[in-house]
């Protein structure tokens, strides 16, 4: 888009828009798009009460949106060359707005999941269009370690702030108003695009030939099958239910078909060479371990704050401000040390897992009935800080893959796990462990309580039952925090046992001219075949 050593410009803007203002308008568009989605998981409880859907239904729709976002990365450069910027933003804004209206008015679960999936895909498309437009403004050297710091600053900040906005609307009026607000914001964005953007093409046009659409759909089915098993497993009693067995079979079959097709078709959605590259499974494993260690933030923290400490939704969501500060500090630290000073991947990951271990150790030693709200600030801050470092370091490491195809496929696989699958897998493992351990602890705590025990004789049964459950919950959380702390310590030792001096020195994004040439060479046989048939 921009030639080296030339002044940065965004040619799709009309001439009356000041040059200094153009990147900030694009960032505004990114923020609006990142706030949007099919469903808003912060309002899950309110949606369950209003729509009579299961909690699992809402979670399935929310994570389906993240799967749609991840799958877009497999074709991100192709759509950049195929569609004009103005058309992209208008189309994506319109689709996401319609998805919001449908999501707030339907109780049909397949429709809700499908709409959320589509909304996630177009949300990522609009985000990539905007971010790629201002990449040279953010980092003139095209340093992806710098660029990814910006990406996670925007994405994670939007997650925290959208949760706050959702609860604000839910308390003030109804969760529906969050959808109305997002639709209005998207309409404003579309109006600005129509007024400020020229209908021009800033990239050489390349048609969408040679894209494995069937492969993309099957990878999506595989991911959604994993989500279904993890989210609905406890509800349906795992593989005793035909629903879970069917989803498992569907996931295994589509995964096998994808790998089989990738062995002989010309342009598979994910090449086998990408999956064989050592950096891809390593990054996926790191993200799964990190998400397992951070799973208590999704389960234990809410159980502690709601069930034990008695916080309402406003008090719980206000802690997102602490996570927001942790995001900013984590991004600044990563930018200064990793992007600027080029600290090694090993050092950054050791720091990140140390922060996560501090989070686990804090709750292991401090968890109690009477924790003040201020006592939760430190662990929430350090877990967010640690996660940001892991995410940026892992994503940057994928630049070792060749551009453009292997890189974008590696990013797709990493995002498929980091955004959706790893978190759900981690939460499922910890939730299952919590159920088993809590049942055991409740049995141990209540084994001496009977109708002739003087200590419990005059205590009402329901009060006694509630006390046992609360105590069993605290004992269970403490025990699992301890287990996870040992896993975190083992991860730190494994990362530090062998010195690695690999640093993010050659993480430069190629120019779009170079990428377009590679894509043109890739699709030229397909174009020749189409011309012959015509």
Task: Give, region by region, the residue ranges found by the protein language model.
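Helix-loop-helix hairpins in multi-pass membrane proteins, especially solute transporters
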Residues: 76-77, 81-214
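Hydrophobic transmembrane architecture of multi-pass small-molecule transporters
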Residues: 417-534
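Helix-to-loop junctions at the C-terminal end of transmembrane segments
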Residues: 71-87, 170, 330-347
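Interfacial helix-cap and linker-helix signal at transmembrane-aqueous boundaries
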Residues: 47-52, 78-81, 112, 165-174, ...
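12-transmembrane solute porter fold
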Residues: 20-36, 41-42, 99, 269-439
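Extracytoplasmic
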Residues: 17-76, 126-127, 298-302
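Short hydrophobic/small-residue motifs within alpha-helical transmembrane segments
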Residues: 65-70, 156-157, 324-325, 421
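Hydrophobic transmembrane-helix bundles of small-molecule transporters
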Residues: 173-285, 290
């Amino acid at each position: 888009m921009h030639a080296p050593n030339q002044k940065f410009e965004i040619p799709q803007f009309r001439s009356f828009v000041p040059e200094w203002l153009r990147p900030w308008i694009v960032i505004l568009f990114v923020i609006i798009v990142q706030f949007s989605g099919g469903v808003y998981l912060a309002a899950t409880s309110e949606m369950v009460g209003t729509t009579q859907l299961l909690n699992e239904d809402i979670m399935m729709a929310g994570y389906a949106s993240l799967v749609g976002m991840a799958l877009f990365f497999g074709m991100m450069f192709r759509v950049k060359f195929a569609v004009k910027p103005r058309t992209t933003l208008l189309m994506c804004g319109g689709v996401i707005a319609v998805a919001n209206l449908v999501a707030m008015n339907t109780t049909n679960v397949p429709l809700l999941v499908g709409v959320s999936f589509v909304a996630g895909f177009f949300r990522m498309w609009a985000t990539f269009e905007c971010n790629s437009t201002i990449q040279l403004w953010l980092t003139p050297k095209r340093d992806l370690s710098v660029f990814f710091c910006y990406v996670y600053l925007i994405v994670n900040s939007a997650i925290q702030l959208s949760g706050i906005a959702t609860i604000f609307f839910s308390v003030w009026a109804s969760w529906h108003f969050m959808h109305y607000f997002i639709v209005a914001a998207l309409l404003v964005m579309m109006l600005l695009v129509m007024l400020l953007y020229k209908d021009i093409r800033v990239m050489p046009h390349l048609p969408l030939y040679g894209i494995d659409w069937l492969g993309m759909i099957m990878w999506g089915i595989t991911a959604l099958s994993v989500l279904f098993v993890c989210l609905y497993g406890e509800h349906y009693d795992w593989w005793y239910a035909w629903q879970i067995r069917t989803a498992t079979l569907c996931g295994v079959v589509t995964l096998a078909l994808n790998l089989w097709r990738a062995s002989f078709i010309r342009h598979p959605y994910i090449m086998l060479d990408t999956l064989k590259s050592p950096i891809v499974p390593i990054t996926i494993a790191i993200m799964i371990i990190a998400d397992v260690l951070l799973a208590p933030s999704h389960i234990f923290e809410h159980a502690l704050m709601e069930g034990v400490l008695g916080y309402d939704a406003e008090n719980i969501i206000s802690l997102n401000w602490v996570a927001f500060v942790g995001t900013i500090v984590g991004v600044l630290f990563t930018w200064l040390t990793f992007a600027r000073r080029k600290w090694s991947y090993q050092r950054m990951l050791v720091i990140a897992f140390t922060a996560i271990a501090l989070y686990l150790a804090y709750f292991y030693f401090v968890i109690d009935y009477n924790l003040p709200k201020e006592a939760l600030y430190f662990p929430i801050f350090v877990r967010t800080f640690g996660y940001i470092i892991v995410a940026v370091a892992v994503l940057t490491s994928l630049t070792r893959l060749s551009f453009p195809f292997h890189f974008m496929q590696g990013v797709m696989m990493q995002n498929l796990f980091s955004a959706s699958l790893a978190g759900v897998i981690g939460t499922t493992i910890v939730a299952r462990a919590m159920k088993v351990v809590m049942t055991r602890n409740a049995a141990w705590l209540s084994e001496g309580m009977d109708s002739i025990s003087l200590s419990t004789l005059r205590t009402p049964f329901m009060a006694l039952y509630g006390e046992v459950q609360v105590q069993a919950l605290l004992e269970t959380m403490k025990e699992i925090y301890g287990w996870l702390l040992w896993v975190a310590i083992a991860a730190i030792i494994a990362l530090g046992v062998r010195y690695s001096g690999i640093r993010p020195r050659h993480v430069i994004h190629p120019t779009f001219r170079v990428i377009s040439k590679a894509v043109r060479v890739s699709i030229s046989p397909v174009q020749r075949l189409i011309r012959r048939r015509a």
